[in-house]
């Protein structure tokens, strides 16, 4: 079993576009993108901000989600992120009540 967390993440670029990727260290990867040493796509669209992320137990699961996300339209991506945020918020509120 892998011992690290694996993240699928979405960045919002300065031009409003989205960039999706995989990492096992969110903060380090965000700094890499903003330093201009990240993906070629984000170099010309800095600064970028962490817009959304999901944590997975395995690299494979995180990369599968990245692949799925990249096949969707922008509208579907925005809807997915909105729905997942609402779901996480509801889960958090439910946990606080327990």
UniProtKB/Swiss-Prot annotation:
Domain of life where this protein originates: Bacteria
InterPro entries (alphabetical): GIY-YIG_endonuc, GIY-YIG_endonuc_sf, UPF0213_domain
Gene3D superfamilies named in the record: GIY-YIG endonuclease (3.40.1440.10)
Species assigned in the record: Bacillus pumilus (strain SAFR-032)
Family under the similarity heading: Belongs to the UPF0213 family.
SUPFAM superfamilies found in the cross-reference section: GIY-YIG endonuclease (SSF82771)
Xref: SMART domains: GIYc (SM00465)
Pfam family, one: GIY-YIG
Name of protein: UPF0213 protein BPUM_0019
Domain GIY-YIG positions: 4-79
PANTHER family xref list: UPF0213 PROTEIN YHBQ
Residues annotated as transmembrane: none
